[in-house]
Regions:
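Conserved donor NDP-sugar-binding/catalytic core segment of glycosyltransferases
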Residues: 1-20
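Low-complexity, flexible helical/coil segments
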Residues: 13-17, 40-47, 83-84, 117-129
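Conserved nucleotide-sugar donor-binding catalytic segment
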Residues: 27-104
Length: 142
């Protein structure tokens, strides 16, 4: 399949850019796989590059999707291949103001967010299928 996204590793550092002796891939056990990434997300936006043709299908992100990077990564997987580059190419600074938290909310909150993610992904993939069928019918007409 065609590569739709690339994800690279990053060295985790503190506020003073001192290494915390861990990379984002180690922290998140990063790799491709829909269910793996529903359980523990590998996709961090600053470490991702996404093919423009994929973004045309992935965007817009639904309002009820809280983790935008995960949405993009999971849908890129649905469209084709996601390649993971093991080399840390940037520093990923951890500090009190990070949007990505090291801890999760309640188990109920996590389940609800994942449920909404799965439902929205299913809806989007069905939209793609319908759109592709309509385009195919248009092409087949004499």
């Amino acid at each position: 399949p065609k590569v739709m996204a690339v994800v690279h590793d990053a060295q985790i550092v503190d506020e003073k850019l001192s290494s915390l002796n861990e990379t984002t891939f180690e922290w998140r056990d990063s790799k491709a796989g829909f269910w793996k990434n529903m359980k523990k997300n590998s996709y961090i936006g600053c470490c991702m590059a996404v093919r423009r043709s994929a973004l045309k299908r992935i965007l817009p992100i639904p309002d009820n999707i809280w983790i935008h990077d995960q949405w993009i990564g999971l849908l890129a997987e649905q469209l084709g291949k996601v390649v993971f580059i093991e080399e840390p190419l940037i520093y990923y600074r951890r500090h009190g103001g990070n949007v990505t938290e090291l801890t999760h909310g309640s188990i109920t909150s996590m389940i609800k967010k994942r449920y909404h993610m799965i439902m929205e992904i299913n809806r989007r993939v069905k939209e793609w299928s319908e759109h592709d069928k309509q385009n195919q019918r248009h092409i087949e007409k004499p």
